[in-house]
Amino acid sequence: MSDAGDSKLAKEQSDASTGTCNGNGTGNGTGSGTATANATTTPTPTPTSIPTAAGSVTDVTATSSMVLAKLDDISSRLTMLESNFNNVFSKINDQNSMILDLKQNNSHAFLRLSSKVNKLETHVAALASNNPQSAFVTDLLNSITNVSSSYLRKMKHNGAENLNVQLSTHENGFVHPTPNDSPNMMGPIYYNQIETSKARGQLKSLNRKKTFTLNPNGIKKRRLGHHHGNSGSRSNNLNVTFDITGQVGQPGYDTSLNSATPNNHAMTPSNVISSSNSYSELQSLNGLQSNTTASDGRTLSPVNTVQALKTPYLTATNQHSLNHGSLNNYNLNFPQFLDNTNSVTLSRLGSSSPVEKRDGIVMSHSAPQLDNGSITYPDNRLHIRNQASQDILGGASQGQPQKINNIDEDGYQEDDEEEESELNKHKNKVGNLKYNTTLTDSHSINDDRKPTVNVYASTGHPVNNTKSEYLEDDESNDSDNSHETDEESEDEVEEYDEEDDMVNEEDRQPYSRKPKEPASERKRKKLRKINKYRNNVIEPRKKDDKEKDAQNSDLNYMLLKAPSSVKTIWEEYVNGIDGNPSIRGLEEKYGNKWRIKRNKKTFSRRKRLYKFILNGIDKGKTADEMIDMLEKQRLYRDENGEIKRRTIGWLQQSLIGI
C-alpha cells in the first residue's frame, strides 16, 4: 500500500513539474538537465514536506465528498418534506372549506328549524284558543259551579223560610193573627209553643253554621218534591201532629200543660218555626215510657202508642189545594164518613173566625184545640169528627191523639218517580188506610212509608174491597159464559170455596145490602170467576212463558266455534246455521244483549269479516266475490312450496282497522 501510494504521489509530482515546464519553454530544458544531474548524483532522494501535503488533500477530498453526499441527502429529504407539507396544506384547506360549508349549512338548518318551531307554536296557540273540547270542559265546570251555587242559595233561602214562616191569607188560605188579638184567643199553651219555637229557632240557627257538604243524590231525591212547582214557590209540608198528653200542639213542638201564664207578645213571622222537622224527632217517639197518661186520666199502653204511630192522617197544604181537588188526585175515598151526616171540619179556638164550606167540607182557619173528644189540626188541616174516624185514627185507644212527624231531614225524597205509579196501583183501596201521605203544593208524596190496605175497618166490616169490585165487574162482563158452569167439577168448586172465604164473607156483609143468593148461583159465579182467571191470567202467562223461553234461547245462542271457511261465517250472519237465529237478526232484535256475556270477544273479531263483506257489497260487489277475495288471502306457500291455508283467526287479525 505504501509503495502504491508513493508511486501515485510521484506521478502527481511529475505531472506537476511537467505542467510547470510547459509553462516556460526555457525552463523545461534547464529543469530536465538539472533533474538528470541530480538523479545521477543522488540516487535515493527523500523529501520530507511532500507526504504532509498529500494527506491533507486526501482528507479534504473525502470530506468534500461526504459533504456533497450529505447535501444530496438533505436535498432529497427537503424535497420529500416539501411534498408532504404541500399535501398536508391541501388537506387543511379542504377541511377548512368543509368546516365552513358545514357551518353555513348548520346556520341555514337552524334558521329553517326556528321558523318551523315558531309556526308550530303559533298553530298550537291557535288550536288551544279554538279547541271545542277545552271550551266544553270550561262550560261544564262553569255549569257545575253555577248549579252548586244556586243549590246552596236555594238551601239557604229555604232555611231562612223555615225560621221565618210567612203567614199570609192570600198565599196560605187562613187568617193571619195580628198583634192586636186577645191573649184569651191564643191561650196559654199557644204562647208557650211560640216561646219554645223561638228557642228552637235559635238552636237551629247555631247548627246551620256547620260546613255544608253537597250531596250529589240530593237533586234526584228532591225531584219529586219540585216536579210540579216552580223555584219561587214555597213547599208547605204541613203534617198532622198529636200530643201524647192529649193536647194538640203546633207541628214539631213539645207543648207543656204546666204553663198557664201566656207570654205578652203576639205571633209574628220572626218567632214562628217551620213545620219541617228532623226525622230524629220522630225517632224520639220510640223512647216513650211504657205507660203514658192521657189528659182524662187513662193510661195508654205501648200497643196503643205504636198503633197511634201507625194511624193514618191527612194534610191539606192550603185552601187552593182543597178547592181544586188535590185529595182526589190520589184517590183517597172515604165512603163511610165523608157524607152529609159525618162532616169533616177544621175546628178552631173561639167562634169569631170565618168559616167556609166547600163541597160538603166545613173549613175554618184557626189555632189548634182539642174540642170535646174531636181531633183538631192546626194550619188548615182536615179534622174528622165522627166516631168512625175515631175508630180509624185511634183503634182501641178511642181516638187518643199521638204525635207523628213525617218530614225527612233536609226535605230529601228517598225514592224516584216510580212512587206515583206505585200509589196509582192502590187507588180505590180504602178500608183501614195505612197511608202516611203528606200533600204539598207540588203534589209530592212522602216516600218513607209504603201504602198498605186492610180489607176490614176497625168495625169488622169490609169498607171497599177492590177484589169484590173486580169480581162484580166479572159478573157483568161474563154473563155470556154461563154455559161453562156444567163443565167444571164439584171438586174444583169445593177447592175454590176454601180459597175464597173472604169473597164469601164479602157477599154476606150488610154493606153490600144485597139479598143472599142461592148456593147454585154462587157456585156458578165462582166457576165463572175461575174461568175468567184462567183465560185472562193463566193462559197469557203460559204464552208469555213460551215467548220468554224463545227469547232466552235466542239470548243464550253461542257463536259457531272454529268455522272452516268464511262462507260458513257469512251464512251464520245472514241466515243462521242448523235452524238457529241469524246474527243479523239477533242484532236487529236484541241489540247487544245477546252478546254481552258469552259472545262479546268472538263477535268483535267476526265483526271485521262482516264489515269487510258489507263494505264490498256497498261498493257494488257481491258477497261471493268478497268471500273469494278473503279465501285467497288465506292461501300461502310453505318452505316446501306447498300451497296451504291460514286460519280464520289469522284472517280476522289481518283485518284489524277495517
From Swiss-Prot:
<dbReference type="GO" id="GO:0005634">
    <property type="term" value="C:nucleus"/>
</dbReference>
<feature type="compositionally biased region" description="Acidic residues">
    <location>
        <begin position="407"/>
        <end position="421"/>
    </location>
</feature>
<feature type="region of interest" description="Disordered">
    <location>
        <begin position="392"/>
        <end position="550"/>
    </location>
</feature>
<dbReference type="Pfam" id="PF12550">
    <property type="entry name" value="GCR1_C"/>
</dbReference>
<feature type="compositionally biased region" description="Basic and acidic residues">
    <location>
        <begin position="505"/>
        <end position="521"/>
    </location>
</feature>
<feature type="compositionally biased region" description="Polar residues">
    <location>
        <begin position="455"/>
        <end position="467"/>
    </location>
</feature>
<dbReference type="GO" id="GO:0000981">
    <property type="term" value="F:DNA-binding transcription factor activity, RNA polymerase II-specific"/>
</dbReference>
<keyword id="KW-0539">Nucleus</keyword>
<feature type="compositionally biased region" description="Low complexity">
    <location>
        <begin position="33"/>
        <end position="55"/>
    </location>
</feature>
<keyword id="KW-0805">Transcription regulation</keyword>
<feature type="compositionally biased region" description="Basic residues">
    <location>
        <begin position="219"/>
        <end position="229"/>
    </location>
</feature>
<comment type="similarity">
    <text>Belongs to the HOT1 family.</text>
</comment>
<feature type="compositionally biased region" description="Basic and acidic residues">
    <location>
        <begin position="1"/>
        <end position="14"/>
    </location>
</feature>
<dbReference type="GO" id="GO:0000978">
    <property type="term" value="F:RNA polymerase II cis-regulatory region sequence-specific DNA binding"/>
</dbReference>
<feature type="compositionally biased region" description="Gly residues">
    <location>
        <begin position="22"/>
        <end position="32"/>
    </location>
</feature>
<comment type="function">
    <text>Required for a complete transcriptional response to osmotic stress.</text>
</comment>
<protein>
    <recommendedName>
        <fullName>High-osmolarity-induced transcription protein 1</fullName>
    </recommendedName>
</protein>
<keyword id="KW-0804">Transcription</keyword>
<feature type="region of interest" description="Disordered">
    <location>
        <begin position="1"/>
        <end position="55"/>
    </location>
</feature>
<feature type="compositionally biased region" description="Basic and acidic residues">
    <location>
        <begin position="539"/>
        <end position="550"/>
    </location>
</feature>
<feature type="region of interest" description="Disordered">
    <location>
        <begin position="218"/>
        <end position="237"/>
    </location>
</feature>
<dbReference type="GO" id="GO:0060963">
    <property type="term" value="P:positive regulation of ribosomal protein gene transcription by RNA polymerase II"/>
</dbReference>
<feature type="compositionally biased region" description="Basic residues">
    <location>
        <begin position="522"/>
        <end position="532"/>
    </location>
</feature>
<keyword id="KW-0010">Activator</keyword>
<feature type="compositionally biased region" description="Acidic residues">
    <location>
        <begin position="485"/>
        <end position="504"/>
    </location>
</feature>
<dbReference type="InterPro" id="IPR052146">
    <property type="entry name" value="HOT1"/>
</dbReference>
<dbReference type="InterPro" id="IPR022210">
    <property type="entry name" value="TF_GCR1-like"/>
</dbReference>
<feature type="compositionally biased region" description="Polar residues">
    <location>
        <begin position="434"/>
        <end position="443"/>
    </location>
</feature>
